[in-house]
Amino acid sequence: MTTITLKLNEPIDVALRRFRRDIEKTGLIRELRARTGYEKPTTERKRKKASAVARQRLQAKRLLPPRKMY
C-alpha cells in the first residue's frame, strides 16, 4: 500500500501529485484498469500489438539523427 506523509507546509496538490506518481510507479492504476472488466483474448492481443507497434515507432524515432533546424 502506498502512503504519503505530508511535509511541513506542503500544499495538498503537491502531495497528491507525489501520491499519483508513486501509484503510477507501482503499476496499481494499470492493474485496476485491467481488472475492471473482461477483455476478450482477441481484443487483448490487438491492444498489446498496437502498443508494441507504438513502442517500436518511438524507439526508431529516437535512433534517427536530429532534423536540421535551418
UniProtKB/Swiss-Prot annotation:
Taxonomic classification: Bacteria, Pseudomonadati, Pseudomonadota, Betaproteobacteria, Burkholderiales
Gene: rpsU2
Keywords: Ribonucleoprotein, Ribosomal protein
GO biological process, alphabetically ordered: translation
GO molecular function: structural constituent of ribosome
Domain of life: Bacteria
NCBIfam families: S21p (TIGR00030)
Record-given protein name: Small ribosomal subunit protein bS21B
InterPro entries in alphabetical order: Ribosomal_bS21, Ribosomal_bS21_sf
Recorded family membership: Belongs to the bacterial ribosomal protein bS21 family.
Pfam families cross-referenced by the UniProt entry: Ribosomal_S21
GO cellular component: ribonucleoprotein complex; ribosome
